[in-house]
Amino acid sequence: MAVGITRRTLFGFRDVERKANIKNKQLIERASNDQERLIKELKSVGFWKGNTSKQEMKFNVVVGNPPYQEKKSSEKTVNNGAFASALYPHFIDLAANTSASYISLITPSRWMTRVGQGITNTWVDKMLQGNHFIKMHDYLNATECFDNVEIKGGINYFLFKPDYTGECQYTLHQNGNNITIDTYLDPINSGVVIRDSMAIRIINKVMAVEGNYFNGNNFVSMVSPKHYFDKGKLLSSNWTGYSKQKDENHNIKLYVNKKLEATGYGWIKESDVPKSHSTIPLHKIYIPKSGGSGTDAIVLGSPFYGEPNSVCSYTYLVIGYNAETHNFSQEECYNIIRYIKSRFFRYMVSIKKKTQDNPRDVFQFVPLQDFSKPWTDKELYGKYELDLFEREYIESLIKPME
């Protein structure tokens, strides 16, 4: 499929003889690994056999729908599924390196929140800090742009000028409504595109209380990295080496996917846990590492209390995992759970979470609280002085969580 899309990007839908051999020249692979020589070939007379001019091919404008991703079956996940690595960043770079005056492409929007295989921090920094985008139309739900096509994280098309530096005319398409503003894609230097203009307003109010909290002092510090207890196949999402009954040897509770075990847990020996043993005796919280669609009104899977002498499979993340900096009481854990279930918390997560997956980085815009007490939405709205319009906006998007 990627080859077909690449061919269409170069030639469009014209009914003409197509004289550049895309597959044999390995354009897709070379777009990521051999750009300098590839660009020389694309500009050469020999590549475009219909070009009778003796001069080098020049690109005034590059327009297209590049291939989005390529599955790499040689790289398996713990669930034995293939990784899908993003291709479109290489084609954006390729277009820019042709010295074209203007570039207009349609691509997934996952890069805006640094999500996905093949999306590097260096590349996102270059896109955001260059400020070369003149216009961008961004769809949170790809079906509003392409009927019956699901693209996690949404889709966008843009006008990019390599020698332009300035604000972007950014249009967000959401639930049939369009909002256009002139702005830099990262006006507060958070490292991501905050795609909701109301979110900028709310973040600014949180910043008035917490400072530049999103660059360090935020809920990310509470959440474990993926693969916290598991290693390889051991304690992976599909691992079934646990006992259904507790006994003298199998006395560590293992929380697993409920599709694997109806009760949601089994029992293992401490020696079955390959790493992170210091967290086992702690009070903690578990939350599914995947939850929601990225555009739904719940945002996250339901968190639950993790008692001492418990661990989890790859299905879950651990909140309060660090014995030195966390070490919460049971009461504090339940207060954290209440905070997670608040609409305010889940709205702040939704600013960055645009796919089903929720790695720890999606909690970047969630401020920390004093967890010696429970928090309600009313208290949180008051703490950050959210006005009635902002409160109603959050509650129009986020449903209550039981």
Regions found by a protein language model. Give the residues of each.
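SAM-dependent methyltransferase catalytic region
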Residues: 1-136, 141-145, 158, 163-170
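Short, amphipathic C-terminal "tail helix"
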Residues: 394-402
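Short loop/turn and capping residues at structural boundaries
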Residues: 11, 392-395
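C-terminal substrate-recognition regions of SAM-dependent nucleic acid methyltransferases
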Residues: 142-315, 319-391
